[in-house]
């Protein structure tokens, strides 16, 4: 019989979101009359922008004609999409990023896990706490950690707490680490990093030959001036950082699937013999070997994001969710509940009232308000006592959910 990958057995029982689903299903079965509003998983609800839909329909028609039919595309994605990304998302912000350094993929979640294929097994890895669970679980699956302790922390990982006291932006590690996961605007806390904070991380990485894996999936939600949208706005980042981006939350592509990863050609890693190897070549080899690219139709839809009409429609979509976040924040304040985030991100990080634990707060919201959030402890031990609410929902659902919460907690 074939041997399994035993590292999977180290994963904590049940991924966070399946456990949420289990509890919600049990409650719904016991209370079929309850109108449950789900504000947990960050999936979008509003339609694709018209510019994207029109471009995709046109691409479908092209696929129906021999003269314009497309088969396998380029390993990195079509150049016209990569050029649009480089021009609008990076060069327009003064970032020295070329289209050849951009790799189109079907999701930043996939890329955040797949990037481990080109990294060694003996790196010291730092993650923030709380953190997007994918960063941790993919390292566990790859054998980069030991078992989890009673707090759910894995042996071998360096945890950097995000707290209200440090404004949910982690302090630099006291020791040398090789790989650093950063996500700003942050999931789950909704916090952002200032230019000075990111410069400190870049300086640390360059001083210690560390690699920053920078998740910028929510950069379109930044509203405050002066907050960097890309790690490459920081001098020196080309020599120490890989950036992950996605069209999922920017343009509603969660069901359409398109994202991209930026690997500068000046970025180097060290081989076992001490020689320096450029990571661009390794990632190109990995992608061309294991990935067949994103559908032509989808890439045309993504390209339309950068059209004049697409930019207007995407900004309106983002603003819709940010308005939801504002409603959530302000209504929680009315109920006397402390909350963070929701200004530069679609997530609101809610402090559990009355000394409740994360899961106790989750259960109380579910049972008394019929509202589903995401327990903060599911993102790490430092998330205990918090709960994440997502602004990805209809306006009617958000307003009704907050009405219920105010009626229960505001009395």
Swiss-Prot record:
List of residues that carry N6-(pyridoxal phosphate)lysine: 249
Involved pathway(s): Amino-acid biosynthesis; L-lysine biosynthesis via DAP pathway; LL-2,6-diaminopimelate from (S)-tetrahydrodipicolinate (aminotransferase route): step 1/1
GO terms, molecular function: L,L-diaminopimelate aminotransferase activity; pyridoxal phosphate binding
Keyword presence, Transit peptide: no
List of residues binding pyridoxal 5'-phosphate: 72, 108-109, 132, 187, 218, 246-248, 257, 292
Xref: Pfam families: Aminotran_1_2 (PF00155)
Catalytic activity annotation: (2S,6S)-2,6-diaminopimelate + 2-oxoglutarate = (S)-2,3,4,5-tetrahydrodipicolinate + L-glutamate + H2O + H(+)
Enzyme class, first EC level, given as a word: transferase
InterPro entries reported for this sequence: Aminotransferase_I/II_large, DapL/ALD1, PyrdxlP-dep_Trfase, PyrdxlP-dep_Trfase_major, PyrdxlP-dep_Trfase_small
Reported function: Involved in the synthesis of meso-diaminopimelate (m-DAP or DL-DAP), required for both lysine and peptidoglycan biosynthesis. Catalyzes the direct conversion of tetrahydrodipicolinate to LL-diaminopimelate.
Subunit structure comment from the entry: Homodimer.
Descriptive protein name: LL-diaminopimelate aminotransferase
Organism name: Synechococcus sp. (strain JA-3-3Ab) (Cyanobacteria bacterium Yellowstone A-Prime)
């Amino acid at each position: 019989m074939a041997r399994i990958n035993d590292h999977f057995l180290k994963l904590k029982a049940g991924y966070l979101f399946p456990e949420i689903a289990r509890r919600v299903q049990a409650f719904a079965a016991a209370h079929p009359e309850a109108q449950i509003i789900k504000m947990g998983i960050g999936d979008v609800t509003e339609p694709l922008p018209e510019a994207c839909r029109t471009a995709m329909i046109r691409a479908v028609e092209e696929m129906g004609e021999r003269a314009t039919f497309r088969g396998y595309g380029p390993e990195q994605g079509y150049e016209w999409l990569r050029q649009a990304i480089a021009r609008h998302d990076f060069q327009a912000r003064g970032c020295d990023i070329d289209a050849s350094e951009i790799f189109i993929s079907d999701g930043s979640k996939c890329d955040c896990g797949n990037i481990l294929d080109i990294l060694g097994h003996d790196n010291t890895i730092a993650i923030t706490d709380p953190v997007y669970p994918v960063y941790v679980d993919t390292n566990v699956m790859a054998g980069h950690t030991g078992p989890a302790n009673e707090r759910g922390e894995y042996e071998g990982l360096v945890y950097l707490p995000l707290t209200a006291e440090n404004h949910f932006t982690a302090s630099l590690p006291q020791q040398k680490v090789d790989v650093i996961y950063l996500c700003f605007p942050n999931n789950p806390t909704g916090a952002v990093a200032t230019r000075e904070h990111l410069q400190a991380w870049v300086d640390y990485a360059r001083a210690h030959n560390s690699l920053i894996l920078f998740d910028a999936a929510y950069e379109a939600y930044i509203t405050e001036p002066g907050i960097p949208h890309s790690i490459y706005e920081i001098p020196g980042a080309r020599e120490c950082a890989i950036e992950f981006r996605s069209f999922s939350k920017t343009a509603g592509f969660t069901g359409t699937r398109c994202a991209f990863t930026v690997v500068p050609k000046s970025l180097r890693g060290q081989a076992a013999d001490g020689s320096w190897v450029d990571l661009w070549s390794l990632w190109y080899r990995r992608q061309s070997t294991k990935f067949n690219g994103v559908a032509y139709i989808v890439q045309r839809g993504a390209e339309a994001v950068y059209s004049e009409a697409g930019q207007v429609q995407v900004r309106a979509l983002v603003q819709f969710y940010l308005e939801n976040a504002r409603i959530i924040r302000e209504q929680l304040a009315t109920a006397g509940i402390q909350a963070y985030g929701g200004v530069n991100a679609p997530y609101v990080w809610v402090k559990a009232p009355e000394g409740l634990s994360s899961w106790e707060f989750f259960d109380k919201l579910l049972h008394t308000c019929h509202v589903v959030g995401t327990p903060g402890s599911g993102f790490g031990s430092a998330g205990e006592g918090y709960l994440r609410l997502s602004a990805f929902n209809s306006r009617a659902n958000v307003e009704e959910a907050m009405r219920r919460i105010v009626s229960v907690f505001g009395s």
